[in-house]
Curated annotation (Swiss-Prot):
Disulfide pairings: none
Family of this protein: Belongs to the major facilitator superfamily. TCR/Tet family.
Lineage of origin: Eukaryota, Fungi, Dikarya, Ascomycota, Taphrinomycotina
GO molecular function: transmembrane transporter activity
Transmembrane regions: 14-34, 59-79, 87-107, 120-140, 148-168, 171-191, 250-270, 288-308, 316-333, 338-358, 392-412, 417-437
Family annotation (PANTHER family): GH10249P
Cellular compartments annotated: Endoplasmic reticulum; Membrane
Protein name per the record: Uncharacterized MFS-type transporter C18.02
Alphabetized UniProt keyword annotations: Endoplasmic reticulum, Membrane, Transmembrane, Transmembrane helix, Transport
SUPFAM superfamilies: MFS general substrate transporter
Signal peptide residue numbers: none
GO cellular component, one term: membrane
Mode of membrane association: Multi-pass membrane protein
Amino acid sequence: MGLKLWVKQRRSLPFIIGTIAIALFTDLFLYGIITPILPFSLVDRVGISPDRVQSVISTLLAVYAVANIAASSPIGFLADKFLTRKVPMLIGLIFLTSATALLTFGNSVPMLIVARVLQGLSAAVVWTVGLALLVDVVGADNVGSTMGGIFGFISLGEIIAPVFGGIVYESLGYYASFGVCFIILLLDIALRFLMIEPREMKNDSTLQDVERTSILQRQDTQDHELKPKRSGLFSSLCLPIYSLLHHKQIFGPFWTSFVNSCLFSAFDATIPLELKTLFDFNSLQCGLMFGVLSTPYFFCGAWAGAMVDRRGSRTIGKRAYAILGCTLFLLCIPRTNTSLNIYLFSAFLAINGVVLAFTSSPGFVQSSHYVAEYELEHPTFFGHNGPYTQLFSAYNIVYSLGMIIGPLVAGFLRDQFNFITSIACLSLLCFSASLMANSCFTDRLDSE
């Protein structure tokens, strides 16, 4: 009885959602812990000259994204070949553990690059397969509030990681900063092994009935649809979801995701150096400022996602991006090293954090609803495993492109011109996302 109860808990919706949330949290934590440390460790530990730090940081951010892009389509293809989504999730842990070890003990730029490549491979797995599993278990109608809540929770990784990294680096040194990483990894490993996803419940009679019904429904329409046969290699590189890129309900969310990625990665590349230059901050203070940016995300994420579920994506998306395009310029006001300007910069970061919380859910909700409706009309189009792995695989590629372009462009503009020029470029991207949301997204009333 006790064993059956434990199995029941392991396959429960809260346990699965919690496992996915911890996996995403771990990915962000291990990605973010080094953000406030790099400007200092590259000089003190690796021996990089100060004038090369910006370019090396941008490179490390970019190679992470390149690895993510290279892996996303093959992972999206291969993940659907496994009987469960759990297997690729476990494979991702191998990449993540190896990356963490290299970041901990690596003392050269090539070793750090390899570590970031492995992190990119791990992220491609967890963000593609994990989010697909999430939509599998909660359904498209609840994806906004669920993702909003998860994004709010995993923003703790973005909050805690830089702060923790800065505190421990300042007080105990480089190696101690990564000790907690392995503890979190152990928790992540345990949860991924313990989780029982719906696909593993093959012996459950109810599930068999559902599968039998689903197969019959698909077979009824299969004869009416002709799909080109693809070789395995071609399928892995050209998933069916890509043929929908000309649909505005897909292209629009992809563009807003690209903009979000540019914003976050540009912040990672420029804000620590701007704080160091403008206010003479150390790694701890830089980490605390990232906490100021991310904390509003934690408190507003679920609320913003629930609003999108209830009202739709267009109004919230277009307004959030338009407001963000304006509030970014607040960061340009403090230009001298005074206590007042430090407080102002903190307040302006918090304001932008609140607005950012309202930009994450609209695109995900819009595209998830659209592919769900498209699959109802074309049941065999995405294959027997449905659209979500493919959708989030494509999202990974788009987001990773932003992670390449964002830090490189923002870092270049800051080096060649100034921080204000970088912010102006990011603001233009936000306004373009607002226009895209207005023309490509829909509200609930529009679809009724």
